[in-house]
Amino acid sequence: MPSAIGIDLGTTYSCVGVFQHGKVEIIANDQGNRTTPSYVAFSDTERLIGDAAKNQVAMNPTNTVFDAKRLIGRKFDDPKIQADMKHWPFTVVNDCGKPKIRVEFKGERKTFAPEEISSMVLTKMKETAEAYLGQSVKNAVITVPAYFNDSQRQATKDAGAIAGLNVMRIINEPTAAALAYGLDKNLKGERNVLIFDLGGGTFDVSILTIDEGSLFEVRATAGDTHLGGEDFDNRMVAHFVEEFKRKFKKDLSKNARALRRLRTACERAKRTLSSSTEATIEIDALMDGIDYYTKISRARFEELCSDLFRSTLQPVEKALSDAKMDKSSIHDIVLVGGSTRIPKVQSLLQNFFAGKSLNLSINPDEAVAYGAAVQAAILSGDKDDKIQDVLLVDVAPLSLGIETAGGVMTKLIERNSRIPCKQTKIFSTYADNQPGVSIQVFEGERAMTKDNNLLGQFDLSGIPPAPRGVPQIEVTFDLDANGILNVAAKDKSSGKEKNITIKNDKGRLSQADIDRMVSEAEKYREEDEKQREAIAARNQLEAYCFNLKQSLDGEGSSKLSDADRRTVQDRCDETLRWIDGNTMAEKEEYEHQMQELSRVCSPIMTKLHQQAAGGPQPTSCGQQAGGFGGRTGPTVEEVD
């Protein structure tokens, strides 16, 4: 059976793993890196994903897209998105209330939904796994922050579909990390484990009870879907923009390229400060020819981000109170996510737990993908001893309910309820002879629906006339294992029934949208492939030219007539000039040039080789000059 993979789709980096031969393999990409930047770049000639996209970001800041996870499943007017737009060099536009990313690609203006950008990253992860496994991959488990709401989960699932994946399950990142921890450590007995997951863009805290290393039960979860390493980078960037303004009276914030180079340097400095107490920033010709050399101490960095670091403790307190536990009942504190390497974050957490030592034994960058790979193996029926007894019980991160008279939020499913779960309540009409009811579904913790998030609504009509309070309307909430909600309403007297899967219609892609994006993704993939083939043909032609020119200086070349020598030299120079002037040519054009060059030069080179070898030799015009030839046909001759 083809392997199912686990993908950690991160804000800044993504990671993919597969469970085989009794263990998880985290798969390195084509650059040899076990994590891949969640970046997609568009240029005049091509689309780049991952390391290649991040490496060229300073040259092409406005068309290099990242942070799609901070956009996915949100509305354009979300205050978080409005704040982020100040930091992003790419353009985000409002498309009927949804954020879309606008870029220039191959000379045209294009807009992409966040799901499409995420799907491109997922495609890269899928291809990374396929290259390693040597077979095509269809099934995947994708992780999301535990605190992602319904629409963010749906949108992530859609991104998987656009990438051509069958998303077997959406699982929570801290839960996946707990799986990695529990299986890696062979835990005995019952242990309460707190997962503290601070990544590039999101923050989660989950408390689980792990029993005998096989039953993983989430007791509570809390977090902030908009807090992570990028926010720390932003603080450092703002600090240096001010310093530059003070020192040189110039404003970096108006220059996208300079800002991007500064951000890259800040990200590097932040990492340095996790192991050193001081970091140096050196950027040549940052703006208007000014070389910018400066330093930042760990203490200064901690002061710049102090409120953000402290804010990580609130979700810890909330999770403890929801799980009805005190600090002393936590056995293990497990750190996940690259930002947990920051010493101040560690010391704040350790002090909160009265000096209890933190568990640093799992790889914070890979733990989530590891757990996702295990869950993928479980769901695809892998009977390996290590995982066959594993049972994962997760919870709903937010309360779910409907609006009742006066705008009150009436909850059917409380937050931190086990999933999957189903709850039914009976409601009635508010007025005499009311012909129908409007069911409005919300998620959130506030008492009034206006303060919570509307997920969707539908009408149940055809209720027989009756005094208020008499009709019995049965509303059922069914929350599946992905944390996605189905709602049904039934009038008990007439038997009329209506149900919806909450699709958050204002925010969710329709099936038609998804189908269109799937075919576009296929088109982009084919274009990428054509681009690769054209580059290969160009390189082959160029190499052939240089090999020919080298042969003119090689041994035996003095036996060539001046006319022949000039012919080869001129044709090579002419071809190289053509290559320089036609960098966007198709593969066929390069191949045609190759054939023309070979037609003129091969006979001359054959002559050269025969003379060099002191007489006629069996040769093949297709194999001259370092193995590059344009002609097809036999490449050997019979020798008498």
From Swiss-Prot:
The keyword Zinc does not apply. Pfam families: HSP70. It comes from the Eukaryota. Keywords: ATP-binding, Nucleotide-binding, Stress response. GO terms for molecular function: ATP binding; ATP-dependent protein folding chaperone. InterPro entries: ATPase_NBD, Heat_shock_70_CS, HSP70_C_sf, HSP70_peptide-bd_sf, Hsp_70_fam. Residues 608-640 are annotated as: Disordered. The keyword Electron transport does not apply. Belongs to the heat shock protein 70 family. PANTHER family: HEAT SHOCK PROTEIN 70KDA (PTHR19375). This is Heat shock protein 70 A2.
